[in-house]
Amino acid sequence: DGSWKRSTGQATIIYGEVMPETGGETHFCDMYGAYERMSDAWKARIADLRAVHNLDFSRTRRHGEDPMTDAQRLETPPVDHPVVRTHPETGRKCLYLGDHAEYIVGMPYAEGRALIEELNAMAPHADLTYEHRWKLREMIVWDNRCLMHRATAYDPVTQGRVIRRCTVLGELPV
């Protein structure tokens, strides 16, 4: 969580208070494994790249929801992070992308977008992913620095979903 911030989240804790009957699952992807499975040529290609992460892009332009106000855009300006992040505790490298990554610094926009989409598509291998099907009052904790996550769609008109989240502040990705 929070890749659109300069200092990113170290860990996230979420608690399922109200869950839909269908949909709303949370999927996780091991980004250590995704990086480690890449060929040496791919690793060399992306080693020094930086991606710009932008909340306005992921919320408004990418998904067409929750348009941000000008004040919100000023509070959350785009930030750049390395595409390959080194975990500060384990020293292992992992891909650091996801939905908020908009473009690659120094690359033509369309080319950078295509590369991000390709890398995001390469990451999820069946044995590197986990789908959590929520039960009421469950809690999950994960390390944001090496896992990518997303929720599946559900119908908010007919079903409720209330997730309480606490993000432990982290550090600047390197």
Language model feature labels by segment:
Residues D1-M139, N144-V174:
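Non-heme Fe(II) oxygenase catalytic core, chiefly the N-lobe of the double-stranded beta-helix
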